[in-house]
């Protein structure tokens, strides 16, 4: 019978890098599943470049990509302060899988779909709150506020953070966390069916580990796969600020 092992990581943690490498060495999986979609996988291979104006236009939603941009800046800043490149644990999983000739499965939902569903799910008040929260978080990190990265992987801390996020933005939590938990669980169950005697190692963010595990243990709780992949419609006026950026070569978030 196929076996699935899920490693929960912090995205800017040297300990997570070490844990991923150790898990591959000890578990000897037949496939390594990572919490990336093809576009993020390609970006990681390019050393995590910032989204260009063309990328923004391709996503077709300025506000959604701005959220991604702010989150990426915050993650890079934290990574610089703790001496670990953002996404280093995913890179470690990719590098070690390739070194051992282990197939890699990209099991996360298309980032464009996630961002569009996330932004479209928010009401005006939630969007304003989200923007201010991100700006304040960046300001706190820039001011040198210490962050205990490893504590973010402790289950009680994870539960508290997830609960606070759900209170802060219930709709956002559904799109960013719950839907992706279900999507990744669907993908892992499919991999398990394809490899009845295989060993599957999944490398995911610590905040997703419990939700994914619950779905795998109780498949009846899963949302139908098709309903998780629909891309909501966006409005043409969302491109106007982007065209202005393109003409003026302005980058709203410094790298």
Feature annotation, model-predicted:
Residues 1-255:
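Compositional signal for N-terminal targeting/processing segments
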